[in-house]
Amino acid sequence: MKTNPNITEPRWLQWLLIGIALAFLLLMLVIPLMAVFYEALREGWQTYLESLTNPEARAAIRLTLIAAAIVVPINAVLGIAMAWLLTRFDFRGKQLFTTLLDLPFSVSPVVAGLMFVMLFGAHTALGGWLEARGVQIIFAIPGIILATLFVTFPFVARELIPLMQAQGESEEQAALILGANGWQMFWRITLPNIKWALLYGLILTNARAMGEFGAVSVVSGHIRGETNTIPHLVEIRFTAAFALSSLLAVLAIATLVLQDILTRIQNRKLAAAARSKQ
């Protein structure tokens, strides 16, 4: 094990901390995850596949993927816009915008779902007006999209803001002075500089969107085969719960692997850039 020569703590303390960390990871993450896969596969692969391919499960998987596919691109646009606004402009009320950005982190997802019900429910003025025109939000896919969008909104912006603040505006200003317009500056200067942070934000957004339960549970109505996502089907279908849970676990692990790959690629490029400057 490599140690920092500047650290003076005794070796036994390092091993103690490593042991505590490993014990925590085993008890809280590895063992429960292994238990999920064990229960999912205990009846054999045929039962496992049947649990994932029955019509209700397919509908839940499809809805989960649709929600993520819609929410992630929208969050990419909104996150970039919010990060640009908060890092490139000074205006009255900027601190309020920054505070509101973190609202989905502090508000319970159940409360967030209830907010949408109170706003778009059939017995509200706006919800009644929309339903009279054939647009149903609550207990339908649009409500699921809105609730998921709310709880995932901060992830992209919060990844971009620190990076954009650290990078400053010098390169963008130079591009404008040299005659680039706003779009050229964004595509050739800003986006390449923030692409890794943007990818991290999108990965986190996708993971949260696929696993969201509380807010979506309130607005979905649990209509079987129509508005149930994978987490909700895990709750109401005990026989298929472990199979569906294992699917969510696989998606989560794939997300972590992708994030690790992107981190390694970024570190290699940063190291190569540092060597080229020497």
Where are these regions (language model features)?
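Interhelical loop and adjacent transmembrane-helix boundary motif
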Residues: 10-13, 50-55, 210-265
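Transmembrane-helix boundary motif in ABC transporter permease subunits
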Residues: 2-9, 70-102, 114-118, 128-129, ...
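Membrane-embedded alpha-helices of multi-pass transport/permease systems
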Residues: 30-34, 38, 77-82, 111-114, ...
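Transmembrane alpha-helices
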Residues: 20, 73, 99, 103, ...
